Regions:
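Cytosolic catalytic domains that perform sulfur/thiol-centered chemistry
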Residues: 1-114
Length: 114
């Protein structure tokens, strides 16, 4: 499978205009955990949903887990559905800084085969 992973702003605009993608804002701060959602509320790419690392892309920390355990399959599928994502649409994730949370969302989609 040969898929383009990175796109330009112009390509994103075209995809949005064609209704062919779901856009997800993944901004998150590990110290100030509400900072990303606040930034999304203050401004984001039009139509973009928000992915919260702690509540959408991870399970709660347990006694035998790491800092951000993988979400269960059903939870992750439900999150994607809540964004309006279906298999016929591209999912475009964006972030700021290191883009680590956007990459996590991309990786979770690969991991779960979506």
């Amino acid at each position: 499978m040969n898929q383009q992973i990175l796109i330009t702003a112009v390509q994103l605009g075209e995809l949005i205009g064609q209704g062919r993608c779901v856009v997800v804002d993944c901004r998150f701060d590990l110290v100030e955990t509400k900072k990303g959602r606040i930034a999304w509320l203050e401004g984001h790419i039009p139509g973009a949903g928000y992915a919260d690392l702690d509540s959408d892309l991870s399970l709660p920390i347990g006694p035998d887990t790491g800092r951000h355990p993988l979400p269960e399959t059903e939870k992750f599928a439900g999150f994607l559905a809540s964004l309006g994502w279906t298999e016929d649409k591209l999912l475009v994730a964006y972030d700021e800084g290191s883009n680590a949370i956007a990459v996590r969302l991309w990786w979770l989609m690969r991991y779960y085969g979506t």
